[in-house]
């Protein structure tokens, strides 16, 4: 699960490199977030020529998580890293590319644009 101060990698080409979660919204009374949950995060590292600068507060959706997640069919899914994709106020991705696989749970949570940009859906 993604909690407060968790470091997230950015899985898109928006210009941010690393994020720190400052407000998870999801299960456990809003204290932790899982796959497909929207969180508020602060940019810790950014590319030098990007529009998104270090210190900016952004919204993002969790696309990969190290902690295993149980699916309804009884299987478990786990990734090698904690990663997120930056989204705007409407819920569409800020970047135009998504790097690495994303979880199938994003399709259930109506993030179809992110799913279509991803090279692989697991």
From Swiss-Prot:
GO terms for biological process: translation. InterPro entries: Ribosomal_uL14, Ribosomal_uL14_bac-type, Ribosomal_uL14_sf. Keywords: Ribonucleoprotein, Ribosomal protein, RNA-binding, rRNA-binding. CDD domains: Ribosomal_uL14. Part of the 50S ribosomal subunit. Forms a cluster with proteins L3 and L19. In the 70S ribosome, L14 and L19 interact and together make contacts with the 16S rRNA in bridges B5 and B8. Binds to 23S rRNA. Forms part of two intersubunit bridges in the 70S ribosome. HAMAP family: Ribosomal_uL14. Belongs to the universal ribosomal protein uL14 family. This is Large ribosomal subunit protein uL14.
């Amino acid at each position: 699960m993604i909690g407060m101060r968790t470091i997230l990698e950015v899985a898109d080409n928006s210009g941010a490199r690393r994020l720190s979660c400052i407000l998870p919204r999801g299960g456990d009374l809003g204290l932790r977030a899982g796959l497909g949950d929207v969180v508020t995060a602060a940019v810790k590292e950014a590319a030098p020529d990007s529009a998104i600068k270090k210190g900016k507060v952004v919204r993002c959706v969790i696309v990969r998580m190290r902690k295993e997640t149980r699916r309804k069919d009884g299987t478990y899914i786990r990734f090698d890293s904690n990663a997120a994709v930056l989204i705007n106020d409407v819920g569409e991705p800020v970047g135009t590319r998504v790097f690495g696989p994303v979880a199938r749970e994003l399709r259930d949570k109506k993030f179809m644009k992110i799913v279509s940009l991803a090279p692989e859906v697991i």
